[in-house]
Amino acid sequence: SERPKRVFNIYWNVPTFMCHQYGLYFDEVTNFNIKHNSKDNFQGDKIAIFYDPGEFPALLPLKYGKYKIRNGGVPQEGNITIHLQRFIEHLDKTYPNRNFSGIGVIDFERWRPIFRQNWGNMKIYKNFSIDLVRKEHPFWNKKMIELEASKRFEKYARLFMEETLKLAKKTRKQADWGYYGYPYCFNMSPTNFVPDCDVTAMRENDEMSWLFNNQNVLLPSVYVRRELTPDQRIGLVQGRVKEAVRISNNLKHSPKVFSYWWYVYQDETNTFLTETDVKKTFQEIVINGGDGIIIWGSSSDVNSLSKCMRLREYLLTVLGPIAVNVTEAVN
Protein backbone atom coordinates (compact mmCIF):
# COMPACT_ATOMS: atom_id res chain seq x y z
CA SER A 1 0.00 0.00 0.00
CA GLU A 2 1.35 3.43 -0.91
CA ARG A 3 1.61 5.91 1.93
CA PRO A 4 -0.82 8.84 1.66
CA LYS A 5 0.65 12.27 0.97
CA ARG A 6 1.37 13.82 4.30
CA VAL A 7 2.28 17.10 5.87
CA PHE A 8 6.04 17.54 6.27
CA ASN A 9 7.05 18.48 9.82
CA ILE A 10 10.34 19.52 11.36
CA TYR A 11 10.91 19.14 15.12
CA TRP A 12 13.42 20.73 17.51
CA ASN A 13 14.98 18.10 19.80
CA VAL A 14 17.89 20.14 21.14
CA PRO A 15 18.50 20.83 24.87
CA THR A 16 18.61 24.60 24.29
CA PHE A 17 16.97 25.12 27.70
CA MET A 18 20.60 24.88 28.87
CA CYS A 19 21.21 28.26 27.21
CA HIS A 20 18.60 30.03 29.35
CA GLN A 21 21.16 30.38 32.16
CA TYR A 22 23.12 32.71 29.85
CA GLY A 23 20.03 34.77 29.06
CA LEU A 24 19.87 33.23 25.58
CA TYR A 25 16.50 31.95 24.37
CA PHE A 26 15.45 30.09 21.25
CA ASP A 27 11.91 31.43 20.87
CA GLU A 28 12.52 32.00 17.14
CA VAL A 29 12.53 28.27 16.47
CA THR A 30 8.77 28.35 15.84
CA ASN A 31 9.10 31.28 13.40
CA PHE A 32 10.92 28.88 11.09
CA ASN A 33 8.04 26.35 10.91
CA ILE A 34 9.88 24.12 13.38
CA LYS A 35 7.79 22.40 16.05
CA HIS A 36 9.20 23.43 19.40
CA ASN A 37 8.32 22.26 22.92
CA SER A 38 6.68 25.01 24.93
CA LYS A 39 9.11 26.85 27.25
CA ASP A 40 11.93 25.17 25.31
CA ASN A 41 11.55 22.11 27.57
CA PHE A 42 13.70 19.20 26.44
CA GLN A 43 11.06 16.62 27.36
CA GLY A 44 8.00 18.51 26.20
CA ASP A 45 4.60 18.56 24.58
CA LYS A 46 5.78 18.06 20.97
CA ILE A 47 8.66 15.62 21.41
CA ALA A 48 10.34 13.75 24.24
CA ILE A 49 13.37 11.49 24.03
CA PHE A 50 14.15 8.98 26.76
CA TYR A 51 17.81 7.96 26.98
CA ASP A 52 18.49 4.36 28.07
CA PRO A 53 15.22 4.23 30.03
CA GLY A 54 14.32 1.56 32.56
CA GLU A 55 16.83 -1.18 33.21
CA PHE A 56 17.57 -2.95 29.95
CA PRO A 57 20.11 -5.77 30.43
CA ALA A 58 23.50 -4.31 29.57
CA LEU A 59 27.25 -4.68 29.97
CA LEU A 60 28.32 -1.22 31.10
CA PRO A 61 31.94 -0.49 30.18
CA LEU A 62 34.40 0.16 33.01
CA LYS A 63 38.16 0.75 32.67
CA TYR A 64 40.61 -1.77 31.18
CA GLY A 65 38.09 -3.71 29.09
CA LYS A 66 36.07 -4.72 32.14
CA TYR A 67 32.35 -4.13 32.45
CA LYS A 68 29.57 -3.96 34.99
CA ILE A 69 26.65 -6.36 34.51
CA ARG A 70 23.27 -4.60 34.63
CA ASN A 71 20.11 -6.69 34.92
CA GLY A 72 21.73 -9.94 33.79
CA GLY A 73 23.97 -8.30 31.19
CA VAL A 74 22.21 -9.86 28.18
CA PRO A 75 18.46 -10.08 27.46
CA GLN A 76 18.22 -13.86 27.95
CA GLU A 77 19.49 -13.41 31.54
CA GLY A 78 17.50 -10.27 32.33
CA ASN A 79 14.51 -9.68 34.59
CA ILE A 80 11.85 -8.04 32.44
CA THR A 81 9.53 -7.24 35.35
CA ILE A 82 12.18 -5.07 37.02
CA HIS A 83 12.96 -3.39 33.71
CA LEU A 84 9.33 -2.51 32.92
CA GLN A 85 8.77 -1.22 36.44
CA ARG A 86 11.86 1.03 36.18
CA PHE A 87 10.82 2.08 32.68
CA ILE A 88 7.47 3.41 33.94
CA GLU A 89 9.19 5.13 36.87
CA HIS A 90 11.61 6.73 34.41
CA LEU A 91 8.77 7.94 32.18
CA ASP A 92 6.72 9.27 35.09
CA LYS A 93 9.72 11.10 36.52
CA THR A 94 10.97 12.65 33.27
CA TYR A 95 7.61 13.36 31.69
CA PRO A 96 4.71 12.74 34.09
CA ASN A 97 1.96 13.97 31.74
CA ARG A 98 -0.04 10.86 30.80
CA ASN A 99 -1.86 12.83 28.07
CA PHE A 100 1.39 13.40 26.19
CA SER A 101 0.48 13.46 22.50
CA GLY A 102 3.81 14.21 20.84
CA ILE A 103 6.55 11.95 19.50
CA GLY A 104 7.96 9.60 22.14
CA VAL A 105 11.47 8.40 21.37
CA ILE A 106 13.04 5.43 23.13
CA ASP A 107 16.78 5.76 22.70
CA PHE A 108 18.35 2.41 23.54
CA GLU A 109 21.66 1.71 21.81
CA ARG A 110 23.58 -0.76 23.98
CA TRP A 111 22.77 -3.81 21.84
CA ARG A 112 20.69 -4.65 18.77
CA PRO A 113 17.97 -7.34 18.76
CA ILE A 114 19.52 -9.07 15.73
CA PHE A 115 22.43 -11.13 17.10
CA ARG A 116 24.58 -10.72 13.96
CA GLN A 117 24.38 -6.93 14.15
CA ASN A 118 26.19 -6.73 17.48
CA TRP A 119 29.62 -5.90 16.13
CA GLY A 120 32.23 -3.30 17.10
CA ASN A 121 31.82 -2.29 20.73
CA MET A 122 28.64 -4.42 20.91
CA LYS A 123 30.56 -7.63 20.23
CA ILE A 124 30.76 -8.24 24.00
CA TYR A 125 27.06 -9.18 23.91
CA LYS A 126 27.79 -11.95 21.42
CA ASN A 127 30.79 -13.20 23.35
CA PHE A 128 28.92 -13.11 26.67
CA SER A 129 25.98 -15.04 25.15
CA ILE A 130 28.28 -17.61 23.54
CA ASP A 131 30.15 -18.16 26.84
CA LEU A 132 26.88 -18.84 28.65
CA VAL A 133 25.97 -21.63 26.21
CA ARG A 134 29.51 -23.02 26.18
CA LYS A 135 29.48 -23.37 29.97
CA GLU A 136 26.19 -25.23 29.73
CA HIS A 137 27.21 -27.45 26.79
CA PRO A 138 30.99 -27.83 26.89
CA PHE A 139 30.99 -30.63 24.28
CA TRP A 140 28.94 -28.86 21.60
CA ASN A 141 30.80 -27.65 18.53
CA LYS A 142 31.34 -23.95 17.84
CA LYS A 143 28.57 -23.74 15.25
CA MET A 144 25.95 -25.31 17.54
CA ILE A 145 26.96 -23.07 20.42
CA GLU A 146 26.70 -19.91 18.31
CA LEU A 147 23.35 -20.92 16.88
CA GLU A 148 21.88 -21.57 20.32
CA ALA A 149 23.36 -18.31 21.71
CA SER A 150 21.86 -16.39 18.81
CA LYS A 151 18.45 -18.03 19.25
CA ARG A 152 18.27 -17.29 22.98
CA PHE A 153 19.56 -13.75 22.64
CA GLU A 154 17.12 -12.82 19.86
CA LYS A 155 14.11 -14.34 21.59
CA TYR A 156 14.60 -12.27 24.74
CA ALA A 157 15.92 -9.16 22.99
CA ARG A 158 12.64 -9.09 21.13
CA LEU A 159 10.70 -9.58 24.37
CA PHE A 160 12.45 -6.62 26.06
CA MET A 161 12.07 -4.25 23.11
CA GLU A 162 8.51 -5.26 22.29
CA GLU A 163 7.16 -5.15 25.85
CA THR A 164 8.83 -1.79 26.51
CA LEU A 165 7.19 -0.32 23.44
CA LYS A 166 3.79 -1.80 24.30
CA LEU A 167 3.99 -0.40 27.82
CA ALA A 168 4.95 3.05 26.54
CA LYS A 169 1.95 2.95 24.20
CA LYS A 170 -0.36 1.73 26.95
CA THR A 171 0.58 4.45 29.45
CA ARG A 172 0.90 7.32 26.93
CA LYS A 173 -1.82 6.32 24.47
CA GLN A 174 -1.92 9.57 22.49
CA ALA A 175 1.80 9.68 21.76
CA ASP A 176 3.56 8.37 18.65
CA TRP A 177 6.25 5.95 19.79
CA GLY A 178 9.39 4.60 18.15
CA TYR A 179 12.96 3.47 18.81
CA TYR A 180 15.71 5.87 17.78
CA GLY A 181 17.87 4.70 14.86
CA TYR A 182 15.61 1.95 13.50
CA PRO A 183 15.45 0.64 10.86
CA TYR A 184 19.23 0.31 10.54
CA CYS A 185 20.76 0.41 7.10
CA PHE A 186 24.55 0.16 7.53
CA ASN A 187 25.27 2.07 4.33
CA MET A 188 28.40 4.20 3.74
CA SER A 189 30.16 1.88 6.17
CA PRO A 190 33.61 0.30 5.71
CA THR A 191 32.18 -3.05 4.57
CA ASN A 192 29.34 -1.53 2.53
CA PHE A 193 30.61 1.80 1.21
CA VAL A 194 27.62 2.59 -1.01
CA PRO A 195 24.33 4.51 -0.58
CA ASP A 196 22.25 1.30 -0.62
CA CYS A 197 21.65 -0.51 2.64
CA ASP A 198 23.42 -3.73 3.48
CA VAL A 199 21.38 -6.49 1.78
CA THR A 200 21.44 -8.77 4.82
CA ALA A 201 20.31 -5.89 7.04
CA MET A 202 17.35 -5.25 4.73
CA ARG A 203 16.32 -8.88 5.04
CA GLU A 204 16.69 -8.63 8.81
CA ASN A 205 14.56 -5.47 8.82
CA ASP A 206 11.83 -7.45 7.06
CA GLU A 207 12.04 -10.01 9.86
CA MET A 208 11.65 -7.26 12.45
CA SER A 209 8.02 -6.52 11.65
CA TRP A 210 7.30 -7.45 15.30
CA LEU A 211 8.97 -4.15 16.20
CA PHE A 212 7.87 -1.93 13.32
CA ASN A 213 4.27 -3.12 13.54
CA ASN A 214 4.17 -1.66 17.05
CA GLN A 215 5.82 1.67 16.20
CA ASN A 216 3.75 4.71 15.16
CA VAL A 217 6.90 6.35 13.81
CA LEU A 218 10.16 5.14 12.26
CA LEU A 219 13.19 7.17 13.31
CA PRO A 220 16.23 6.45 11.13
CA SER A 221 19.37 8.42 11.95
CA VAL A 222 20.95 10.42 9.13
CA TYR A 223 23.91 12.08 10.88
CA VAL A 224 26.61 12.79 8.29
CA ARG A 225 30.39 12.72 8.55
CA ARG A 226 32.92 15.29 7.40
CA GLU A 227 35.24 12.55 6.06
CA LEU A 228 32.67 11.73 3.37
CA THR A 229 32.48 13.67 0.12
CA PRO A 230 29.39 15.90 -0.33
CA ASP A 231 27.90 13.29 -2.68
CA GLN A 232 28.56 10.47 -0.21
CA ARG A 233 26.78 12.46 2.51
CA ILE A 234 23.73 12.70 0.26
CA GLY A 235 24.01 8.97 -0.48
CA LEU A 236 24.04 8.18 3.24
CA VAL A 237 20.81 10.11 3.80
CA GLN A 238 19.19 8.70 0.66
CA GLY A 239 19.79 5.04 1.55
CA ARG A 240 18.56 5.37 5.13
CA VAL A 241 15.39 7.31 4.34
CA LYS A 242 14.57 4.99 1.43
CA GLU A 243 14.87 1.92 3.64
CA ALA A 244 12.62 3.37 6.36
CA VAL A 245 10.03 4.36 3.74
CA ARG A 246 10.26 0.87 2.21
CA ILE A 247 9.56 -0.68 5.62
CA SER A 248 6.68 1.73 6.22
CA ASN A 249 5.13 0.93 2.84
CA ASN A 250 5.17 -2.77 3.69
CA LEU A 251 3.22 -2.26 6.92
CA LYS A 252 -0.56 -1.97 7.07
CA HIS A 253 -0.53 1.12 9.27
CA SER A 254 2.26 2.91 7.29
CA PRO A 255 4.06 4.57 10.21
CA LYS A 256 5.48 8.02 9.51
CA VAL A 257 9.19 8.35 8.85
CA PHE A 258 10.99 11.10 10.75
CA SER A 259 14.74 11.25 10.20
CA TYR A 260 17.00 12.20 13.09
CA TRP A 261 19.34 14.90 11.77
CA TRP A 262 22.24 16.62 13.55
CA TYR A 263 23.47 20.10 12.57
CA VAL A 264 27.16 19.25 13.09
CA TYR A 265 29.36 16.59 11.48
CA GLN A 266 29.39 13.39 13.50
CA ASP A 267 33.18 13.10 13.27
CA GLU A 268 33.81 16.84 13.75
CA THR A 269 31.25 18.07 16.24
CA ASN A 270 32.54 21.63 16.47
CA THR A 271 31.78 22.21 12.77
CA PHE A 272 28.26 23.06 11.61
CA LEU A 273 27.02 21.56 8.34
CA THR A 274 27.58 23.87 5.39
CA GLU A 275 24.54 25.59 3.96
CA THR A 276 24.77 23.29 0.92
CA ASP A 277 24.87 20.18 3.10
CA VAL A 278 21.81 21.32 5.04
CA LYS A 279 19.86 22.06 1.85
CA LYS A 280 20.85 18.84 0.13
CA THR A 281 20.29 16.53 3.10
CA PHE A 282 16.88 18.12 3.77
CA GLN A 283 15.95 17.78 0.09
CA GLU A 284 17.05 14.14 0.09
CA ILE A 285 14.74 13.40 3.03
CA VAL A 286 11.83 14.98 1.15
CA ILE A 287 12.58 13.39 -2.24
CA ASN A 288 12.78 9.89 -0.77
CA GLY A 289 9.39 10.09 0.91
CA GLY A 290 10.21 11.10 4.48
CA ASP A 291 7.46 12.72 6.57
CA GLY A 292 9.75 15.03 8.44
CA ILE A 293 12.98 15.80 10.23
CA ILE A 294 13.91 15.78 13.89
CA ILE A 295 16.73 18.24 14.50
CA TRP A 296 18.80 16.76 17.32
CA GLY A 297 21.51 18.27 19.45
CA SER A 298 23.74 17.02 22.22
CA SER A 299 24.01 18.67 25.64
CA SER A 300 27.70 19.21 24.88
CA ASP A 301 26.65 21.43 21.93
CA VAL A 302 25.10 23.93 24.35
CA ASN A 303 27.18 23.75 27.52
CA SER A 304 28.81 27.18 27.28
CA LEU A 305 27.81 30.73 26.43
CA SER A 306 29.89 30.78 23.24
CA LYS A 307 28.41 27.49 22.00
CA CYS A 308 24.88 28.77 22.66
CA MET A 309 25.64 31.99 20.79
CA ARG A 310 27.06 30.09 17.82
CA LEU A 311 24.06 27.77 17.61
CA ARG A 312 21.63 30.68 17.84
CA GLU A 313 23.43 32.50 15.06
CA TYR A 314 23.42 29.33 12.93
CA LEU A 315 19.69 28.83 13.54
CA LEU A 316 18.87 32.43 12.54
CA THR A 317 21.10 32.61 9.46
CA VAL A 318 21.36 29.08 8.02
CA LEU A 319 19.17 26.40 9.55
CA GLY A 320 15.97 28.38 10.14
CA PRO A 321 15.63 29.92 6.68
CA ILE A 322 16.25 26.54 5.00
CA ALA A 323 13.65 24.88 7.26
CA VAL A 324 11.10 27.50 6.16
CA ASN A 325 11.88 26.97 2.47
CA VAL A 326 11.64 23.19 2.71
CA THR A 327 8.40 23.07 4.71
CA GLU A 328 6.72 25.69 2.51
CA ALA A 329 7.81 23.97 -0.70
CA VAL A 330 6.50 20.57 0.43
CA ASN A 331 3.33 21.70 2.16
From Swiss-Prot:
Disulfide bonds join 19-308, 185-197. GO terms for cellular component: extracellular region. It holds the Pfam family Glyco_hydro_56. This is Hyaluronidase B. Hydrolyzes high molecular weight hyaluronic acid to produce small oligosaccharides. One of its GO terms (biological process) is carbohydrate metabolic process. It catalyses: Random hydrolysis of (1->4)-linkages between N-acetyl-beta-D-glucosamine and D-glucuronate residues in hyaluronate. The active site is at 109 (proton donor). Keywords: Disulfide bond, Glycoprotein, Hydrolase, Secreted. It is found in: Secreted. One of its GO terms (molecular function) is hyalurononglucosaminidase activity. Expressed by the venom gland. Glycans are attached at residue 79. SUPFAM superfamilies: (Trans)glycosidases (SSF51445). Belongs to the glycosyl hydrolase 56 family. It comes from the Eukaryota. Its EC number is 3.2.1.35.
